[in-house]
Design a protein with these regions (language model features):
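Append "and, occasionally, other polyanion-binding protein interfaces
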Residues: 1-107
Length: 107
C-alpha cells in the first residue's frame, strides 16, 4: 500500500474537501489502519479486498452522492456554519460502511 498514492487519490477525487498540506507519520498510520478496516468491509460486501479502484469508487460515490460533505453549509439550529470535511474523516471505518450502505447520501 502506498500512502502517497492514497493521498494523491484523495486530492484527485475530492478536490473540494479540506485537504492536507503534508503527509505525516500519523496520517500514514491513519491510512494503513483505514485500509485494513475497509478491506474487511469490502470482502464482506464485494467478496474481494479493497484495491485502489475500489477506493476511487468510494471517493467518487461521495463526490456524486454526498455533496453535503464537501460544502460549507449553514446550521439552521445554531446559526453556525458546518464546514466541509477533511481528508481524515473519509478515512474512518464508520463513514466508509455508512457510505457503502447508502446512509450518508444527500436527501
Amino acid at each position: 500500500l502506498s500512502c502517497d498514492e492514497v493521498w494523491q487519490c484523495l486530492k484527485d477525487e475530492l478536490p473540494e474537501a479540506r485537504g492536507w498540506r503534508c503527509l505525516t507519520d500519523e496520517r500514514r498510520n491513519l491510512i494503513r489502519t483505514f485500509w485494513g478496516e475497509a478491506n474487511k468491509i469490502a470482502r464482506n460486501l464485494d467478496g474481494k479486498p479493497m484495491d485502489m479502484d475500489g477506493f476511487r469508487s468510494y471517493l467518487r460515490y461521495i463526490a456524486q452522492n454526498c455533496r453535503w460533505m464537501l460544502e460549507d453549509r449553514p446550521d439552521q439550529k445554531s446559526g453556525k456554519t458546518w464546514r466541509r470535511m477533511k481528508f481524515d474523516k473519509f478515512l474512518t471505518e464508520k463513514l466508509y460502511i455508512e457510505v457503502r450502505e447508502g446512509d450518508r447520501d444527500d436527501r
